[in-house]
Regions:
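Alpha-helical membrane-protein architecture signal
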Residues: 2-6, 182, 221-222, 226-234, ...
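Alpha-helical transmembrane segments of multi-pass membrane proteins
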Residues: 10-14, 190, 226-239, 243
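Cytoplasmic juxtamembrane interface segments
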Residues: 110-128, 170-172, 203, 281-303
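Long, hydrophobic alpha-helical segments
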Residues: 184-204
């Protein structure tokens, strides 16, 4: 085993593909994704205003909308056509239309309508701006009601009880900041590292056949395939495991991502993820003992993992056959264990069930 592992280290040292796919590219991926979403939540997204009322109430609504963290009022438009054209040119993500007579309608209790239009081409921007625009339209009606009740001599407590009969106590568990970096970097980066493992494993075995080194390899293992595979995978396992654990240390203890589950699930998850991907790569090469075909299968399996792991769309909402196939993807199990044991801090026994 030791001599086969040394032989593999020599092969890896001479071939720059191993250096790039096992060390350089994973480090680049970690830095890229963690810095790309460093802010956590998108802020100051451009919004337009079509103010046809030009009243004190409409200006107050615009000021309140501009005060939101995720929204920034960048321009005013004369009509809806101009604002729609600005959305089509990607100058703004949304716009709000305040029609003529809004203030008068509020005072006369005629329920005027405020319209807002937003683009869902970018799902995150569309959902966040929809939330802000909906909130500001609700606040507009509440402000008018508050002014009228105050004029009638009602106290602040009576006004708040009338405007909001049921108070909502909202708690976002696990990620109270709605930080997209917490959600995406902890899934995308491990998924890409797993993809590199998927590709390097059949590549390292396939090159033995391609360059006619298989006889020498098996001779060193005394024609024992298990010993040959173990010796060949050992250096790769140690390198990938080091990269994986360094990534987890970086996000959980340097960037301070939430991890109430503690260090033990993090270490176990890293070990299991590396070994599972290597086993899948070995199985793919055994299924298709060709360098080209086995790497194609592994690349397909690794890319599909991003869609079927359940991080962006829940697996239980997919068709039953896809739910069954999803259990064959290591990234699916990585995501479930991360979500249960690391992110939410549930006991590790829950991951077995």
């Amino acid at each position: 085993l030791y001599h086969i592992a040394l032989r593999e280290c020599g092969i890896m040292w001479k071939n720059p593909i191993y250096l790039f796919c096992m060390v350089i590219f994973p480090i680049v991926v970690v830095i890229f994704f963690t810095t790309l979403m460093q802010g956590g939540v998108p802020t100051d997204m451009p919004v337009g205003i079509v103010d046809q009322d030009n009243s004190h109430t409409s200006r107050q609504l615009v000021h309140k909308l501009d005060a939101f963290q995720t929204t920034k009022v960048v321009s005013h438009y004369e009509n809806i056509a101009e604002a729609r054209h600005a959305i089509q040119k990607n100058e703004i993500y949304a716009f709000m239309v305040i029609p003529n007579g809004t203030e008068a309608g509020l005072m006369a209790q005629k329920q005027p309508k405020i319209s807002f239009y937003y683009s869902s081409v970018s799902l995150a921007a569309g959902s966040l701006l929809f939330r802000d625009l909906k909130t500001i339209s609700t606040l507009g009606g509440a402000a008018a009601g508050m002014a009228k009740l105050s004029a009638l001599g009602k106290t602040n407590n009576e006004i708040m009880t009338f405007l909001q009969p049921i108070a909502v106590d909202l708690h976002m568990i696990g990620n109270p900041y709605a930080n997209y970096n917490y959600y995406l970097s902890t899934v995308m980066v491990p998924g890409l590292i797993m993809l590199f493992i998927f590709l390097i494993t059949p590549y390292s075995i396939g090159t033995e056949l391609k360059f006619n080194r298989a006889r020498d390899w098996m001779r060193m293992a005394s024609n024992n395939p298990y010993l040959a595979i173990a010796g060949k995978m050992l250096p790769q396992t140690l390198i990938f495991l080091s990269i994986f654990l360094l990534f987890e240390f970086y996000i959980y203890y340097v960037l301070d991502f939430p991890h109430p589950g503690g260090a033990l699930p993090i270490i176990l998850l890293g070990i299991l993820s590396v070994l599972a991907c290597q086993c899948c790569g070995i199985f793919a090469f055994g299924l298709m003992p060709s360098l080209r075909m086995s790497m194609s299968i592994c690349s397909l399996w690794g890319v599909v993992s991003f869609s079927i792991c359940g991080a962006t769309y829940p697996l239980f909402s997919m068709d039953s056959p896809i739910q069954a196939i999803g259990q064959l993807f290591p990234m699916r199990h990585y995501y479930m264990i991360y979500q249960m044991n690391i992110f939410n801090g549930f006991p590790m026994s829950d991951a077995v069930l």
